[in-house]
Structures are given as structure tokens and as C-alpha cells.
């Protein structure tokens, strides 16, 4: 394990990562800009389509993708925005593990998954 990876793991164990909203790049990202979840706004800004989640290999397994999703879902919730989970991590991993966020899923997506 490299020193960078060891430092990252130690920091993650003691405190949650700081996730910031980068509106210009249309993504939520870690403070170091290395991990992120990208989105596209649809329906005149009423729907956030989460299209891609990226975590560098040396930071995988630390829960960063989940923290990024929570930041996006919290943002959507506080702004009355619904979500389309186009990213496979969001739809196949995050939502099954965190079903309390499912009410934010855009109704047309929910209907098509029944």
C-alpha cells in the first residue's frame, strides 16, 4: 500500500469525506476533486439524472461512492428535485442498500421498473 493510500484510509476511518457541489461541472466531488458523481439536469431543472460515478482505484472500498450519492440525494431533496438513477452504481448498488432514498426517484423511472 502506498503512503497516499494509507493516509487516505486513515483519514476516511476517522472522519467522513467532505463532498462539495461543483455546479459548473455538474457534479458532486470530493474536496480533492478525485472522486465524483456527474449529473445532467432535465425537465427544466426539476429532475437530476445521475449519469456517472467515479472513484480512483486507490480510493475504492472506502465508501466514497456512497458518500457522493448521499450528497446528490440530499441536494435533490432540499431543492425538491427528483432523480433518475442512470448510473449503474446508483441504481444497482446504492439504492438497494439505501431504500429510504427511493421516494426521490423520478416517477416515470419508477413506473418503468415495476
Curated annotation (Swiss-Prot):
Class in the EC hierarchy, top level: transferase
Domain of life: Eukaryota
Keyword entries, A-Z: Acetylation, Acyltransferase, Peroxisome, Transferase
Annotated positions of the N-acetylthreonine modification: 2
Catalytic residues as annotated in Swiss-Prot or TrEMBL: 87 (nucleophile)
Gene Ontology MF annotations: histone acetyltransferase activity
Location relative to the cell: Peroxisome
GO CC, one annotated term: peroxisome
Annotated Pfam families: Acetyltransf_CG (PF14542)
Main subcellular location: other
The protein's Enzyme Commission number: 2.3.1.-
Annotated binding of CoA, by residue: 52-55, 61-66, 88-89, 93, 97
Function statement: Possesses in vitro histone acetyltransferase activity with histones H3 and H4.
Identification of the protein by name: Acetyltransferase At1g77540
Amino acid at each position: 500500500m502506498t503512503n497516499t493510500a494509507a493516509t487516505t484510509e486513515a483519514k476516511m476511518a476517522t472522519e467522513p469525506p467532505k463532498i462539495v457541489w461543483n455546479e459548473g461541472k455538474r457534479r458532486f466531488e470530493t474536496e480533492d476533486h478525485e472522486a465524483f458523481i456527474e449529473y445532467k439536469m432535465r425537465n427544466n431543472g426539476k429532475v437530476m439524472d445521475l449519469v456517472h460515478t467515479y472513484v480512483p482505484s486507490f480510493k475504492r472500498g472506502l465508501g466514497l461512492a456512497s458518500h457522493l450519492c448521499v450528497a446528490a440525494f440530499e441536494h435533490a431533496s432540499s431543492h425538491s428535485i427528483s432523480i433518475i438513477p442512470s448510473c449503474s452504481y446508483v441504481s444497482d448498488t446504492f439504492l438497494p442498500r439505501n431504500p429510504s432514498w427511493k421516494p426521490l426517484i423520478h416517477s416515470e423511472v419508477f413506473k418503468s421498473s415495476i
